[in-house]
């Protein structure tokens, strides 16, 4: 299976959100900060995850 392709990235507050396109299926999002990542199926949830990850 081919890894998902990163089709966009938004940097914010010391973290980032990437939009990923799998070989088959729907887009999903990866929110990362401070060495931790969370995955979600919608951008709104990805934004909430990033807010949680960047808190000190």
Spell out what each predicted region is.
Residues 11-12, 22, 32, 39, ...:
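Generic detector of intrinsically disordered, low-complexity, polar/charged segments
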Residues 1-28:
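Short N-terminal "domain-start" leader segments
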Residues 32-47, 53:
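A short, exposed loop/beta-hairpin motif centered on an aromatic-Gly-Thr core
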Residues 1-2, 52-56:
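Short intrinsically disordered terminal tails
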């Amino acid at each position: 299976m081919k890894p998902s392709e990163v089709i966009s990235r938004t940097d914010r507050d010391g973290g980032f959100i990437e939009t990923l396109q799998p070989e088959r299926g729907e887009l999903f999002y990866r929110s990362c900060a401070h060495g931790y990542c969370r995955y979600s199926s919608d951008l709104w949830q990805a934004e909430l995850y990033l807010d949680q990850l960047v808190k000190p």
